[in-house]
């Protein structure tokens, strides 16, 4: 279900504060965050944000095509290793 248009997009306050500070000083550094639910807004374009995937922080460079999506969409949490090659033991 999508978010109501009456509400503003959710962005973590600490993340918004860090991006605003970097935009005023024109610095580019990696921002580390655990907030996968934050929505990408136009002020984030050009920054690299390291999003936590449950094990490590995965760096993501924000482009204009990502605006409106969530940060968690770009760092997958599951690692599919494939099905078993020889499944004879489970058939017994």
UniProtKB/Swiss-Prot annotation:
Family per record: Belongs to the universal ribosomal protein uS19 family.
InterPro entries linked to this entry: Ribosomal_uS19, Ribosomal_uS19_bac-type, Ribosomal_uS19_CS, Ribosomal_uS19_SF
HAMAP family reported in the protein's UniProt record: Ribosomal_uS19
Gene: rps19
Keywords in alphabetical order: Chloroplast, Plastid, Ribonucleoprotein, Ribosomal protein, RNA-binding, rRNA-binding
GO cellular component: chloroplast; mitochondrial small ribosomal subunit
Function in brief: Protein S19 forms a complex with S13 that binds strongly to the 16S ribosomal RNA.
Protein's UniProt keywords contain Zinc: no
One Gene Ontology term of the molecular function aspect: rRNA binding
Protein name, per record: Small ribosomal subunit protein uS19c
């Amino acid at each position: 279900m999508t978010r109501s248009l009456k509400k503003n997009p959710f962005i973590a306050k600490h993340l918004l504060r860090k991006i605003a500070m970097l935009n005023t000083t024109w610095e580019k550094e990696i921002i580390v965050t655990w907030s996968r639910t934050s929505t990408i807004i136009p002020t984030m374009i050009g920054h690299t944000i390291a999003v936590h995937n449950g094990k490590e922080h995965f760096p993501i460079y924000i482009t204009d095509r990502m605006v409106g999506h969530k940060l968690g969409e770009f760092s997958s949490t599951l690692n599919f290793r494939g099905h078993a090659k020889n499944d004879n033991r489970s058939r017994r």
